[in-house]
């Protein structure tokens, strides 16, 4: 916010702006004093300095030049804390799923065989109707997205089944939702896999229109039989959203388009206009990079003011936010390393196959050469006999 004070002669000075710049600089200086005076913070800071991009993000946040990277696990789970910010998290899940939901609980990642592997953020939540949703964010466009998504969704189904059969500690009271002593499959509810891709691979570029960014998937049968399977999928290409939609929203053009909401995929009676607008609001928040961008979004979506306040609170807690940055970097480093290992394994397997093929070709050539040598020897012998 800037305030111009006229001092005569048509001139003005931006007093508030100068004060804010000074305050931003003081946040950085105060943070550096705290870091240098704490051996643990200093060690964490040195770790972060090994990555030029991430130390830049941290310092620029303190200087008021960058916002927090909300699409990383430590930051997301603070801003969308399921206890302190349950309403905000429920709003997010509601607008992504296209139905009103209330988040009841968040499950730990370690309960899963698949979740938390090669991803930036994952959160498994249960809604008021008993259905389960997994929210995941991928920073890197990983290989085999269809296979990974299928595994994540299957894991959610298994989690819910274990709850119903009473295998999970603390959930035996949910052994049967219909009053029977024996769990029933009809107690199962939908599971929703929500994945936000920061860097979409080519499989997420629609042949219909490259600007389509919100992909909704369900299993349907060619005969039209009414068998509703449990697994639903929502895949959001944030880079596509930023490229083709975000600039319009920043200009105030927030009318809902077919790119934002495909009515054929939802029950319109369950989807409010607020949910549609919330979808634009949260996706815009996720791709915003600077405080100035967030300020502009607040003019369009005033209820983002509470998010800005939560973000700004971390300017007063540089040690805590430093730990969050270092944790996010460790997750990214681990995921990148695992991705590289997987790709190296694939390359080694491909080289092995190539080696085997070359070996087979060599054997064929050797066999062919031996046959030719034998034929030459036979012809020589025949020629010698004819010359006698």
Description of each model-found segment:
Residues 2-388:
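Elongated, amphipathic alpha-helical interaction scaffolds
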